[in-house]
Amino acid sequence: SQGFSTPTVAETLTPEGQINTDLKPETGTNFELGFKGNWLRNRLYTELSLYSIQIDNLLVAQRISEDQYVGINAGKTNHNGIEFLINYNFAFAKKILVKPYLNAALNFFEFDEFINNDQDFTGNKLPGVPKYTMNFGLDFKTESGFELFTNYRIVGELPLNDANSEYNDSYNLLNLKASYSFKIYPGLQLNLYAGVNNALDVHYASSILTNAVGFGNQAPRYYYPGNPRNYYGGIQMSYCF
């Protein structure tokens, strides 16, 4: 498939507030091959996707002051990747449903041709895109209404700028949630739940500002820190008419 994306009004403005007539819309061609399947009497489900996207004149935001950005074209880029998902359902002791799962993505994104301000970034990895991401865990559900959800997330390192001179380290996060549902009246159901995010209290960046620039003799601020270990809980009530 093929497509295009035009610049926004903000991206077309120069630092002087004039329209940048040299800015071009980005165009792309996408190739994708996918597969889905159920196995072992529908207990095992799998997905696999391979894709390749070639983009010309990729639109990127370049920071020129503390709160001002301009749009530029980043030549040609390649976005290649693999995504897959596996989950399995089986009953344990006939009253407990166990569901292990795994989904992951491998990303191979790079500049195929990009020269900006006499700097050649051709062959560099695209900033802000991790090498890989992975989620896996076990979910439990009982006939009595008790449920337990576990999720372990792995995010690979990623470049912070076009030059690939700075990187954000990889990190792992563990999230847990438990709930209990029961009827308190015919048609009226109550759900109690509680959980913990970042159970291992990992220091990580929840969001990234690519190609950050330092101002006022300050270092560039690439990172916005993620929340430390935190807890939550609640009560939900539902009624079926």
What are these regions (language model features)?
Residues 2, 25, 37-39, 76, ...:
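Residue-level signature of outer-membrane beta-barrel architecture
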Residues 33-37, 84-88, 102, 136-142, ...:
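Residues on the lipid-exposed face of transmembrane beta-strands in outer-membrane beta-barrel proteins
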Residues 50-54, 72-160:
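Gram-negative outer-membrane beta-barrel transporters
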Residues 98-99, 157-159, 180-241:
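C-terminal beta-signal and adjacent terminal beta-strands/loops
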